[in-house]
Amino acid sequence: MAQQVSGRQPRYKRILLKLSGEALMGSEDFGIDPKVLDRMALEIGQLVGIGVQVGLVIGGGNLFRGAALSAAGMDRVTGDHMGMLATVMNGLAMRDALERSNIPALVMSAISMVGVTDHYDRRKAIRHLNTGDVVIFSAGTGNPFFTTDSAACLRAIEIDADVVLKATKVDGVYTADPFKDPHAEKFDHLTYDEVLDRKLGVMDLTAICLCRDHKMPLRVFNMNKPGALLNIVVGGAEGTLIEEGQA
């Protein structure tokens, strides 16, 4: 059930939350951890409870990694299509977790899957968001060679979201991988051009350029920190904010 969070007013009306498929694994090496799904559903429910409209894009890396198969000779387009199907599986699992918490949710797929998901339709997605449904966008952009990060930024622009929130395993963007370099320093704020110039690897080039060209703010944060998502939505300074530079 969507939880009411008293006394906290949202800064954003509509967000696009990007989750990695790996985030759904929890402590496992593969697949989906039901406890992680339930926790994420609870946090998303808190946002719905304060009137925030939530669009969601989930990667597929917990179920399928095309890089190794591509290196072994698999056709890239075939691998990308398999990856798209993995994102649909994750979307269905998340919808189930949300609905078990009495949070209405809809899965839309960029690839037609009659009887399994709704086909992606921008106007229909916005109507559902306006009624308080969580809309899960799956199958990426529907095209090979585009990442789910690019899909998240594209959908955010299409539905006129206020911000893209990218959930990761670390609490923002660093000068280097903080798991490998103990001297890595965290950025609190960056411009799109700084991300590109420094080759920080927050998202792929296409995704960052989409956000830059359409002035879509992007915040990178640690989804494993309890309450971080809600704190961002009510105006907290979690993680790293990436936005247009000041003229």
Curated annotation (Swiss-Prot):
InterPro entries: AceGlu_kinase-like_sf, Asp/Glu/Uridylate_kinase, Uridylate_kinase, Uridylate_kinase_bac. UMP binds at G60, D80, T141, G142, N143, P144, F145, F146, T147, T148. It comes from Pseudomonas entomophila (strain L48). The lineage of its organism: Bacteria, Pseudomonadati, Pseudomonadota, Gammaproteobacteria, Pseudomonadales. It is found in: Cytoplasm. The keyword Membrane does not apply. Its main location: cytoplasm. Catalyzes the reversible phosphorylation of UMP to UDP. Homohexamer. The keyword DNA-binding does not apply. Inhibited by UTP. It is an enzyme of class 2 (transferase). It comes from the Bacteria. PANTHER family: URIDYLATE KINASE, URIDYLATE KINASE PUMPKIN, CHLOROPLASTIC. ATP binds at K18, L19, S20, G21, G61, R65, T168, Y174, D177. Its EC number is 2.7.4.22. It catalyses: UMP + ATP = UDP + ADP. This is Uridylate kinase.
